[in-house]
Amino acid sequence: MGWIGDFFSGVGSLISSVSSSLGGLASIAGNFLKVVSPYLGIVTNIISVIGNILGVKKDDENLEDIGAKAMKSDKKPENFDSYNDYIKHLRENIKLDKEEMENASKELKLARTAVGATIVSKGIEEKKGMEISVDTWVAMAKAGLDGKIDVVNLILDTFKDKNEQKDFANYVDGKAGFKEEKIVTDKLTDIYKSLEPNASDIDIEKKVMDMDKSK
């Protein structure tokens, strides 16, 4: 595990090194990387697809490119009224060198992806009118929700405040108390019933229970 920790530490250092371009986003992206690193690929895929659905990013835009443009731009997120305006600026005004992108180190590619994911996540928060904790993204990855975007979308709409998101993450980790577990399972049951009205109660219960990865 040592070399993996060193690798992600190096990626984090790359993010910190461009803090002048990213402003406050640098520390947010650094924390994002630290928390999601074991699930980075799954989390970034979930964020990317939700970003597409909500119009935060275009289907042909990838997180690495968005992050690379942010690290290259002389304007920071705080120079704009919203993250969605910032993303529009990156899309329209910052160009990338294709050869440089292809030849970038693995560490730099991951740093750019982490920055891009953080930016799109913030854009999703604006669209949803809520804050989304990094632990919530990780919990959805742990719960096996990659590719189950309808479920992810409704989870975000259902567990909107910090305490609700914490209860959901604790449920996935098998750490929720009895009361919290009951609240979370009831909400997840309602989500699945709305998506699969013809599914049996047993099938829905299994889907909900399968999200508790401690069992």
Task: Give the label of every model feature segment.
Residues G51-K206, S214:
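Amphipathic, membrane-inserting segments
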Residues M1-W3, M209-K215:
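Short acidic DE-rich linear segments
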